[in-house]
Swiss-Prot record:
Name this protein carries in UniProt: Glutarate 2-hydroxylase
InterPro entries xrefs: GlaH, TauD-like_sf
E.C. no: 1.14.11.64
Organism of derivation: Shigella flexneri
Cofactor note: Binds 1 Fe(2+) ion per subunit.
Residue runs in coiled coils: none
CDD domains to which the protein is assigned, alphabetical: CAS_like
Chain positions recorded as Fe cation binding sites: 160, 162, 277
Top-level division of the source organism's lineage: Bacteria
Membership in a protein family: Belongs to the glutarate hydroxylase family.
Catalytic activity: glutarate + 2-oxoglutarate + O2 = (S)-2-hydroxyglutarate + succinate + CO2
Cofactor: Fe(2+)
Role of this protein: Acts as an alpha-ketoglutarate-dependent dioxygenase catalyzing hydroxylation of glutarate (GA) to L-2-hydroxyglutarate (L2HG). Functions in a L-lysine degradation pathway that proceeds via cadaverine, glutarate and L-2-hydroxyglutarate.
One Gene Ontology MF term: oxidoreductase activity, acting on paired donors, with incorporation or reduction of molecular oxygen, with 2-oxoglutarate as one donor, and the other dehydrogenated
Amino acid sequence: MNALTAVQNNAVDSGQDYSGFTLIPSAQSPRLLELTFTEQTTKQFLEQVAEWPVQALEYKSFLRFRVGKILDDLCANQLQPLLLKTLLNRAEGALLINAVGIDDVAQADEMVKLATAVAHLIGRSNFDAMSGQYYARFVVKNVDNSDSYLRQPHRVMELHNDGTYVEEITDYVLMMKIDDWEHLDHYFRHPLARRPMRFAAPPSKNVSKDVFHPVFDVDQQGRPVMRYIDQFVQPKDFEEGVWLSELSDAIETSKGILSVPVPVGKFLLINNLFWLHGRDRFTPHPDLRRELMRQRGYFAYATHHYQTHQ
């Protein structure tokens, strides 16, 4: 724990009654909340958005906000403020979201619709160059020959932030809280922490332009935020290379790492600037197939919390 950010009491009010969903602290950490839409809410939402296939959401971006409003209305307009409050709360900033009745791989389109509705209650999802849409779906199989760790099943995908190789700031990711990282102060105060570094993506990301930014910056209250991924940062010299290697080791060996099971149909929604995320290895199996979905974007309802190069 670093001295800059004290963990506040959990903001979840056990006596609070919500309409259309429940909210409890997760078993893994009081920072991570579990939000579950009731069976009735899920059923009514899917019925009311049935007229729009996923393709309609891809082609008409305003419909993404429409389905968000439908979901919020079904929750007596308590959902949107709760999402924003949680994600912008430094002591939390993460939700594991579940909808009763959406739990089968055959419901992939329903999962995209629900995730789209939730994401567009807090902002807007960025264009994903890898898929050519506002979201990406990709498959992890037992054998993989891709050019990044994203689809490789039998190795750990190290902790990282999303959006490091694009120019847009990525506020949220729909998929380790840095305040729980015991080495944060050491690396945040290092002279290289604020040096702009080059981030370059492999061909599969369909992003040809390199971007430059530091690994660390601060939010409006001077607290650390990160934009980091070990695979795409390109050190220019020995000093940067050694520091980045030590930084990676310090993150991956942290005692503050959480392991959060995400069953079919559930998704994580996190503040991308002060949570890192990764993925553990899958157990080898000839028939291994897991399809994953992501959305990442920016908050549209608050002054930006990222202060560049301060």
